[in-house]
Amino acid sequence: MTTNSVTSGRRGEPLVLRDLSKRFGAREVLRNTQLRVEPGQFIAIVGRSGCGKSTLLRLVAGLETASAGSITVNDKLLTGLSDDTRIMFQDARLLPWKRIIDNVALGLPKDRRAEALKVLDQVGLADRANDWPARLSGGQRQRVSLARALVHKPRLLLLDEPLGALDALTRIEMHRLIEDLWRASGFTALLVTHDVQEAVALADRVILIEDGRIALDETVSLARPRSQGDAAFAALEKRILDRVLQKPAAPERESFTHPNDGEPRWPGVPAHGVRWAV
């Protein structure tokens, strides 16, 4: 296996953030953020609650508007939602009144329904196509959410703590599934996670956000597939975790908070958009 993803020839989109800032009221959550992501790279974003991780992801998704700076996707200025971008959240957000196949096919023309079944097969749930969401486990629901995103063949996949509510064994299974599908499809991926081990397991680069700025950009030069029991893996995980913990926790704030990341929310700012897996 190669040490990192081969970005040349991948169908993922390049992403560039220039002087990106975001304010909620008087609080600046992101400030002058600079980031370049090559096509097909897998980027993990870590940091303490409230540091700006999920806000950055929502800006890239087009669910929030930047206070300053710009986002360029595939050399085009981002001005809103994109058909080439999909986002997954910790909550699978399946429609309980629709069967699994219909959740995956949501937004597809009728003549592409067969594609939904094919993607369900890729995530190991073809035999549950006609079940209701309530009959699935948490891990299975997230597999459906992943299938619903991938059926649209995104060039940029955003993952906002999608595995945070799953048990340890299910998380490991999902790591393997996400990595396999990423390697097969070649999309660019941005993962927000509190789990440094998860970041090292999946990413080409681990980005630490601290006080609204990128404080660390660590290349993960470990061969794939990665073993969490490997000494080099453990050493890199410890180094990044030590750096995350080096910064004392921020004092509590009096404000509305974002449910995913503890980031400030304010009246009139939409909490979600329509492109979460549609």
Curated annotation (Swiss-Prot):
Q: Name one Pfam family in it.
A: ABC_tran
**UniProt biased composition (Basic and acidic residues):** 251-264
Q: Per the record, what are the reactions this protein catalyses?
A: ATP + H2O + aliphatic sulfonate-[sulfonate-binding protein]Side 1 = ADP + phosphate + aliphatic sulfonateSide 2 + [sulfonate-binding protein]Side 1
Question: Which UniProt keywords are listed?
Answer: ATP-binding, Cell inner membrane, Cell membrane, Membrane, Nucleotide-binding, Translocase, Transport
Q: What class of enzyme is it?
A: translocase
What are the boundaries of the region Disordered? 251-278
| SMART domains per record | AAA (SM00382)
Q: Which CDD domains match?
A: ABC_NrtD_SsuB_transporters (cd03293)
* Positions with a binding annotation for ATP: G47, R48, S49, G50, C51, G52, K53, S54
Q: Which GO terms describe its cellular component?
A: plasma membrane
Q: Which family does it belong to?
A: Belongs to the ABC transporter superfamily. Aliphatic sulfonates importer (TC 3.A.1.17.2) family.
Q: What job does this protein perform? A: Part of the ABC transporter complex SsuABC involved in aliphatic sulfonates import. Responsible for energy coupling to the transport system.
Protein name as it appears in the record? Aliphatic sulfonates import ATP-binding protein SsuB
Organism taxonomic ancestry:
Bacteria, Pseudomonadati, Pseudomonadota, Betaproteobacteria, Burkholderiales
